[in-house]
Amino acid sequence: MTDTLFERSDIDALLAGRHPDPFACLGPHGQTGQVVVRAVLPGAKSVHALSPEGAELGTLACVDRAGCFAGTIPRNGGAPHYLLAIDWPDARQVIDDAYAFGTLLDDAVLARFSAGDPAAVLDCLGATPARIDDTDGVRFAVWAPNAQRVSVVGDFNGWDGRRHPMRLRRPSGVWELFVPGIGAGECYKYELRAADGRVLPHKSDPCARATEAPPRTASVVADVAALDAFAWHDEGWMHARPRADRYRVPWSIYEVHAESWQRVPEEMNRSATWDELAERLIPYVQGMGFTHVEFMPIAEYPFGGSWGYQPVAQFAPSARFGPVDGFARFVDRAHAAGIGVLVDWVPAHFPDDPHGLAQFDGTALYEHADPREGLHPDWHTCVFNVGRTEVGAFLAASALAWARRYHVDGIRVDAVASMLYRDYSRAEGEWVPNVHGGRENLESVAFLRMLNDTLHGAAAPAGVVTVAEESTAWPGVTAPTGDGGLGFDFKWNMGWMHDTLAYVREDPVHRRYHHDRMTFGLVYAFSERFVLPLSHDEVVHGKGSLVAKMPGDAWQRLATLRAYFGFMWAHPGKKLLFMGSEFAQWAEFAHDATPHWDLLDAPAHRGVQRLVRDLNRTYAAEPALHALDCHAAGFSWLIGDDRDNSVFAFARRDEAGHLVVAICNFTPVPRASYRVGLPAPGQWRELMNTDAAPYGGTNAGNDGAVWAEAVPAHGEAWSALLRLPPLATLWLRPA
């Protein structure tokens, strides 16, 4: 009898975790006048079928001591609704049968996924609490086209891959299963058997919306409905965002490593939670006059020393900072304070942690199979195969999810240069040319265009900004995709950063020989739309902090940094400054330590902080300093060739004719009567002086104002004699 209820071949295949189609034998299967019910429940003592009201419908006999059960129940017309009453050694469990449910995902959404629609990834993959046929549970779906078998495992089944093998939906390669009786908060992973028969290490869900806190590695079922129904209060912000001309408004970005911005030393040096960061970071950013906060990657990452740049869960805010809805609360409060939120996002590569994406289904699924394409030589990580339709859709869906679910205002795309060149950091013979024999990565170009079109299109909330960290001269990074560009809104100006930092590192007596480093950036300043980045990358790995790069004694170093900040904030391009630099921290960035806030007890460091605050406020208040950041009409040199005195002067303007003139003296020698051409006659007010006493300077200057007289100089009809403070920048504005 039992042989007819449960075929031996099915029993053996299920217990070995090799059955190609568990739904073909498990669950209810009709026979004349009755229904055969089969279940695999290793460790169960007995199993009974009950009606929803609790009446016994039949007993499932143990047909194999390893945990296979089968029995019959009455048909009673249509397909019966039954429950399984499972007697475990220590308790009875009454649940719906996972194998009594039909297919879950619509064929159309699976077709969209296979065609590369990022929105389809959000619609079908991951773990989603659901109610199906009046039964609550979780719908699991994962892409693993080359696996022989996929099971979902978790606390709910003792992490036993025999309990919940999934259904393969051909031809999409997506596996699905509805597990009744569980919900948000459950830990889970996937157990996969590769095509060659290997059982792989348990894998986290690539599309998990939540995770355990490291070093634990399980995915966590998120309350998706609650996240989607989050009570946002930023309607005004979201409505106004696309209506602001992002290129004409001030951008001053405070770059933050969320894990270390303000640790809690009395609690084992833990990171602050999102709610704690909202209480402390948002008022700080607002008070300092920054317009945006940019987080180094916050998608879950196993290794803290990667600073987030080796993520394993592209859709999940790291559990280091508390529940995922805490990040939504942070963004909501930031918007209420008038602060935009950007996140660093990593589509170039991923770590090879065994629970992650590497060899996900036993094959190079997310990465390239050829190590000349699939292994990154600098970071020893796996390179995403963005040319594969489903992988490109997966990544773009991640960016889309941050914009949709968490209202982030933009993403900064990491390591774009490494994606664009097939020979990036590779020697001859270690890379594969493209189809035309060249070094350009055509698949990455297509992916980046698709990404930007997605985030700038109807699928995303209006007004999302994309920023490229691209360190080469690749043309058209910020040009529209329709014109052959990559479609980014802004690009980090790495050349400007390298050149100008190299200049200020020089002893003042030698700066005359490196004068062009400060002026060369204007040759190409308007070829792209730029952000001027003084980022975390410049204050790690032995490079020294910004102030530590400067030569001279402590006073000269601080003065040079102040002068450099004055030059930067007046220079065309949006601004970015890494945490700790705003008060001239001496130490390099350390991910396991907090910035040295105690330095603010010293007047000199408070002065630098006050300067950055005032630079931000003045930059935002003066349209001349930001409205034409991306247009050559907004800039003109007044003095660009006085290398002997290491003096620079230039004018910034907007379309309405507002003017600001910046004059920089990068020597410790005060200039008592230095003539500077000015674009307008009359009184010019001293708008900014980085040598002012409140900033820690000597208070040398021009008593608040100068008069432009009809003496031609530097191509202008008017000029003024100025006192230039040592190692300082002045800003002047017509009174």
UniProtKB/Swiss-Prot annotation:
It is an enzyme of class 2 (transferase). The active site is at D414, E469. GO terms for molecular function: 1,4-alpha-glucan branching enzyme activity; cation binding; hydrolase activity, hydrolyzing O-glycosyl compounds. The keyword Cytoplasm does not apply. Keywords: Carbohydrate metabolism, Glycogen biosynthesis, Glycogen metabolism, Glycosyltransferase, Transferase. GO terms for cellular component: cytosol. Transmembrane segments: none annotated. It comes from the Bacteria. It catalyses: Transfers a segment of a (1->4)-alpha-D-glucan chain to a primary hydroxy group in a similar glucan chain. One of its GO terms (biological process) is glycogen biosynthetic process. SUPFAM superfamilies: (Trans)glycosidases (SSF51445), E set domains (SSF81296), Glycosyl hydrolase domain (SSF51011). Its EC number is 2.4.1.18. InterPro entries: A-amylase/branching_C (IPR006048), Branching_enzy (IPR037439), GlgB (IPR006407), GlgB_N (IPR054169), GlgB_N_E_set_prok (IPR044143), Glyco_hydro_13_cat_dom (IPR006047), Glyco_hydro_13_N (IPR004193), Glyco_hydro_b (IPR013780). Pfam families: Alpha-amylase_C (PF02806), CBM_48 (PF02922), GlgB_N (PF22019). Pathway: Glycan biosynthesis; glycogen biosynthesis. The keyword Kinase does not apply. HAMAP family: GlgB (MF_00685). Belongs to the glycosyl hydrolase 13 family. GlgB subfamily. Monomer. This is 1,4-alpha-glucan branching enzyme GlgB.
